[in-house]
Amino acid sequence: MHTFFVTSTGFGVGLTSTSLGLVRALEYGGLKAGFYKPVAQQHPGNSKLEYSTELISRTLGLAPPAPLPLATVEHLLGEGQIDDLMEDIVRRFKQASEGYDVMVVEGMVPTRHVSYASRVNTRLASSLDADIILVSSAEDDALQAITDRIEIQAQFFGGAQNPRLLGVILNKIRTDHSDDLFEQLKNHSTLFHQSSFQILGCIPWEDSLNAPRMADVVTQLQAQIVNAGDSEKRRVQDIVLFASAAPNSVTLLRPGVLVVTPGDRDDIVMAASLAVLNGVPLAGLLLCSDFPPDPRVLELCKGALTKGLPVCTVTTNSYDTAANLHRMNREIPLDDHERAERITNFVANHIRQELLVKRCGEPQEQRLSPPAFRYRLVKRAQEADCRIVLPEGYEPRTIQAATICQERGIARCVLLAKPDAVKAVASARGITLPEGLEMIDPEKVRRNYVAAMVELRKHKGLNEPMALAQLEDNVVLGTMMLATGEVDGLVSGAINTTANTIRPALQLIKTAPGFKLVSSVFFMLLPEQVVVYGDCAVNPNPTAEELADIALQSAASAQALGIEPRVAMLSYSTGDSGSGQEVEKVREATRLARLARPDLLIDGPLQYDAAAIASVGRQKAPGSPVAGRATVFIFPDLNTGNTTYKAVQRSANVVSVGPMLQGLRKPVNDLSRGASVEDIVYTIALTAVQAASQR
């Protein structure tokens, strides 16, 4: 499923009309196209309905979900919760996109009240992994002004260097030489020199498409209806303010003209009526200056009225009435299906749909954005329906995380703690414990696992008193619950060390078949995508064989979470440029990993920049299937991995999820002792997904 994100270069460019036409153009190309506007922006006269969503729903017969209210979005932004906002939008988008080949997503329109629109649009496009299409108006401005607006907006999305920035649709073009427009724009902007940035549509100005119905004039001017006539059908193609005597004005009485005149100008009223009786389909008659028409004159004009001539009155004088008409909102009214349909087809016919359809057919390198990762992680955890034990059941963050997981259906959490103690902590912290949250008093169940533990460790000389003593540690108790199959996974580490969490697992759970060691990965939520770092927490100095094992484990973990694994074996040199014991270890690990999994994309040794940055990768490792596009980064030792992970996390303010332990027969995961409630929630979700994949 492909996604196009359309965003405007300013206010009044016709973004929604372009979205209508874009969906129709994609349908012309044989694709089933859907629409979604993530954030509501109210329009004048439509206080209850989100304009874009409602108009597209009525015109195209689609059923897009309701967008988030602007007030909700502003509250989340103000609280610094943009990641939560994006995750919610990704969730709604996934639901909205089911069954479609392609989705058109409409961004926020920058206005003086929504100055943050461009920042939100940038995050939206990235979170939805979308191709970006700019929409700009070429109405009256000079070419330099047009290109300046396009370039400024393009910079928000990475400019010409971003291959996902496809081009621009130019709307409201008031020239008959649109074919020459591209060459003219190239002379004013280097952006158009890039072969990847194209004009995707040139939509000329068409007066007839902007003609409102007389009913719209009545509504917006709050006019009083004298004769409704065909006000729902007749359209205002031109407006004429009649001030001269009738004989001097008759040539202005043309089809589609709205006659504006003071209500006491009986001569103009009768002249307009005669024109209608002679077959001229005037748009209507608007009487101003608070002069009601003379009933005797209206009786004389009855023939014209019965032929459908709309007549209405306003209280404003001629000058103010003309000004009000000029200020009318020319957007398509929600109930004007005829005009919406005509504009949709007109725009669609001026969009280069063959380019967009071709783009949809091109294989795209999958990139999992942080909000999409979090959404997918939670959804898969909910589907897994796993029981996860939390040995640190008294710890406040753990209690709150368990509450969230229980309420959201992420996992069925088991707190190892006395229920009264848990309730006391929850009460003190203002946490409402949900129904069904399981709390087990460790003192009442320790002896239940003595025999099973002795059986598992009898080869090490373990006896019952020794087992009971070890079971006093809740981590050991929780690990035994996992070993006996009573729970599906274990999460600990908020107050315990990594060694205290992992040691019981190595002794009682042991490694999974086919794996020689236990390692770890962090999921690094970089701004553009989620990547995997391994091993940054467990193995100090792995051998080449162990490093190959870590690479294969990490690739499997990435794949389980929807990340396409492209594995970079990292070193301080790239390819054959360096030598030494450490480089040779990485080279040998790469060979072993490729031998074990020839279907995986694995390359090394690679320097970090060659693995992560496309331009550097092309220069340092031309022909590499991984360089510049790696999603799984395997560090040569713990010192390098842990230092890099913390440097990226802190200096770039990157959220990380993990460490997730891999290679165990059943999932056990360690927390950082500084873990937030959110960190614990996502680690529980990770554990549930791991458990489901091992069933």
Curated annotation (Swiss-Prot):
Residues 372-695 are annotated as: Phosphate acetyltransferase. Its EC number is 2.3.1.8. GO terms for cellular component: cytoplasm. Keywords: Acyltransferase, Cytoplasm, Transferase. Pathway: Metabolic intermediate biosynthesis; acetyl-CoA biosynthesis; acetyl-CoA from acetate: step 2/2. GO terms for biological process: acetyl-CoA biosynthetic process. InterPro entries: DRTGG, P-Actrans_bac, P-loop_NTPase, P_AcTrfase, P_AcTrfase_dom1, P_AcTrfase_dom2, Phos_Acetyltrans/Butyryltrans, PTA_PTB. It is an enzyme of class 2 (transferase). It is found in: Cytoplasm. It catalyses: acetyl-CoA + phosphate = acetyl phosphate + CoA. The keyword Nuclease does not apply. Disulfide bonds: none annotated. Its main location: cytoplasm. It comes from the Bacteria. One of its GO terms (molecular function) is phosphate acetyltransferase activity. Involved in acetate metabolism. Homohexamer. In the N-terminal section; belongs to the CobB/CobQ family. PANTHER family: PHOSPHATE ACETYLTRANSFERASE (PTHR43356:SF3). The N-terminal region seems to be important for proper quaternary structure. The C-terminal region contains the substrate-binding site. This is Phosphate acetyltransferase. It comes from Nitrosomonas europaea (strain ATCC 19718 / CIP 103999 / KCTC 2705 / NBRC 14298). The lineage of its organism: Bacteria, Pseudomonadati, Pseudomonadota, Betaproteobacteria, Nitrosomonadales.
